[in-house]
A protein has these predicted regions:
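Loop/turn segments within WD40 beta-propeller blades
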Residues: 56-66, 102-107, 125, 142-147, ...
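A detector of tandem-repeat and repeat-rich interaction/domain scaffolds
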Residues: 67-71, 78-80, 88-90, 101, ...
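Intrinsically disordered, low-complexity acidic/Ser/Thr/Pro-rich linker and tail segments
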Residues: 1-61, 66-79, 87
Length: 249
């Protein structure tokens, strides 16, 4: 067996953890089997008054015994849900147009809107901590790690922010909407933009890799023949999925 193909090989999760591939396969197989035979329950969550454009889910939250779902919609609101009961815990208002992207951790929630702003919230209390302005068109993607936040916009630009100070710098190069962003660090313990990299996916059919320390594009990945909607990194591969139904690795 070669490296990466043996029983000990692992699969990298979104949080950087490594799980044995057999355990991941068994889990996915059980989910597929339960779905096929109707062994599942359905809960419909109602509250938004217009289309829902983004969501994020966390199963384990410190000091909480239930999973949390947060959704954003064209009704300009963000809703925090208790998935165990289906109850709306909080409704966050403040955006002037639809909410297109969001991400949250144990306490902090960041939302991006077509009103061209980012908002940083304490989702547990509902407090609005900061509003970030800089993009000239709506914000359609974001990603953050600790104090580093990157946002992508319909203005074709990326901005990298310090969540604490509100300072930012732009990354220019894409020629159309920036649909997806993914931070990547060479060191799992690094919280500084000095050692962080960023993948971006765009409607211009390309994916770009950026060096945040030098604020420059290191590489342009070309291959999709349509807009690229998603990008995801793992420990040994970078994968993107586009509207051309293609996949590049």
């Amino acid at each position: 067996r070669t490296d990466g193909q043996g029983a000990g090989a692992g699969v990298s999760g979104r949080n950087g953890s490594i799980r044995p591939w057999k355990a991941v396969y068994c889990e996915r197989f059980a989910i597929e089997r339960n779905w096929r035979y109707g062994r599942y329950c359905v809960r419909v969550l109602r509250g938004h008054t217009e289309g829902i454009m983004c969501l994020a889910f966390r199963e384990k939250i410190s000091q909480l015994s239930h999973p949390i779902l947060i959704t954003g919609g064209y009704d300009r609101t963000v809703r925090v849900w208790n998935l165990q009961t289906g109850e709306t815990l909080r409704v966050l208002t403040g955006h002037a147009r639809g909410v297109r992207c969001l991400q949250f951790d144990d306490c902090k929630l960041i939302t991006g809107s077509m009103d061209r702003t980012l908002k940083i919230w304490n989702w547990r209390t509902g407090e609005l901590l900061r509003t970030l302005e800089g993009h000239t068109e709506g914000i359609v993607s974001l990603t953050f790690k600790d104090l580093i936040l990157a946002s992508g916009s319909a203005d074709s630009s990326i901005r990298v922010w310090n969540c604490q100070t509100g300072e930012c710098f732009p990354l220019n190069g894409h020629r159309d909407w920036v649909n997806a962003l993914q931070l990547w660090s060479g060191s799992s313990s690094s919280n500084s933009s000095d050692s962080m990299f960023l993948f971006s996916a765009s409607d211009d059919f390309t994916i770009r890799l950026w060096d945040l320390r030098h604020r420059e594009c290191l590489m342009v990945f070309q291959g999709h023949v349509g807009p690229v909607d998603r990008a995801q990194t793992c420990s040994w591969i970078h994968e993107s999925i586009g509207r051309d139904r293609g996949r590049c690795c």
